[in-house]
Amino acid sequence: MYRTKVGLKDRQQLYKLIISQLLYDGYISIANGLINEIKPQSVCAPSEQLLHLIKLGMENDDTAVQYAIGRSDTVAPGTGIDLEFDADVQTMSPEASEYETCYVTSHKGPCRVATYSRDGQLIATGSADASIKILDTERMLAKSAMPIEVMMNETAQQNMENHPVIRTLYDHVDEVTCLAFHPTEQILASGSRDYTLKLFDYSKPSAKRAFKYIQEAEMLRSISFHPSGDFILVGTQHPTLRLYDINTFQCFVSCNPQDQHADAICSVNYNSSANMYVTGSKDGCIKLWDGVSNRCITTFEKAHDGAEVCSAIFSKNSKYILSSGKDSVAKLWEISTGRTLVRYTGAGLSGRQVHRTQAVFNHTEDYVLLPDERTISLCCWDSRIAERRNLLSLGHNNIVRCIVHSPTNPGFMTCSDDFRARFWYRRSTTD
């Protein structure tokens, strides 16, 4: 949403409206005090024009509509944190400690990556065993709510029809390291230690192999689709960021070598409007890029005091970047100024993390979540004031390597070196 520039005359008009409203409501002494302080150029008559303007603005302001949606259990993309206007927000969404495990799926090796589809209906998990699973969130919830006697009496056909794992994909020959759903098509992209990016058409139940692939020169570490679905960003063990045309597989890189990182790229993510993307690297820097020119706009040097940057994502309104590093700290950055506005600390009290994981928002961006590697628990903070909430024990038998939160619902997936992926959900009282 674009805002017009506010000038001195606009403020003078605002003060006159405030005085008129105060006079209309009978607060004469307060109005006179304001008149003596501001000294308006013309007489202010009692009026409730300000009240009508506010009511009209609230009825027609898309932001107000989105705000109302954003405080429910299910949200649409576009709502979220905005520190310019969120001073008095009452958090309504559930904190992490209120979630419970609803389903567990197992791989034959460490599970280290997961991703949600844009509508929050599907989750893909990837493993060191080179396999990929696609799970249906509604089926996982239904399975967890099913009485044990009903589950035991299911026929093989019923079990297959109701099974949460709707696809299992095999086409990599080494660990699956990154995953991304296409924004509009039934296509899943995956990257691997086998140096390939593969595209799977999961609309076909029988399809287990990729229909397209890109051969890279290094291990893939992070991928992100352009919101149109026509391009995909690829971060690898090499410091040079790649952008591929999905249809032609033509590769684009910045024309200025100085734009690039100095070490492996750990995280790449587009914002919702595709006019920017952000990268984080083992070199300790976060870079903000122009989504059209493919040039680096800003570099946040030593974003985590020199520690490796593990993740960097945009808030839904693209005003902020949420990052995490191997210093076990999450930070909220204001893009317009490059400042750290909020620091979320306490996840590494028993020692800094060794392995890469992510800081994520919940679906309403009321909370920031970050796994604590040593205690195998989930830290949760109020995203606006960094107040720590109750820890959630994640129930894994080994370190948690990945967390992804639903973009639309109170659910998230954790992936661990214990070979398992756990689906967590906060059921409402009506479920």
UniProtKB/Swiss-Prot annotation:
Gene3D superfamilies, per database record: Cleavage stimulation factor subunit 1, dimerisation domain (1.20.960.50), YVTN repeat-like/Quinoprotein amine dehydrogenase (2.130.10.10)
WD repeats: 106-145, 171-210, 215-254, 260-301, 303-343, 395-431
GO biological process: mRNA 3'-end processing
Matches recorded under InterPro entries: CstF1-like, CSTF1_dimer, CSTF1_dimer_sf, WD40/YVTN_repeat-like_dom_sf, WD40_repeat_CS, WD40_repeat_dom_sf, WD40_rpt
Transmembrane segments: none
Record Pfam families: CSTF1_dimer, WD40
Domain of life: Eukaryota
Domain notes: N-terminus mediates homodimerization.
Its biological purpose: One of the multiple factors required for polyadenylation and 3'-end cleavage of mammalian pre-mRNAs. May be responsible for the interaction of CSTF with other factors to form a stable complex on the pre-mRNA.
Entry protein name: Cleavage stimulation factor subunit 1
Organism the protein comes from: Pongo abelii (Sumatran orangutan)
Phylogenetic lineage: Eukaryota, Metazoa, Chordata, Craniata, Vertebrata
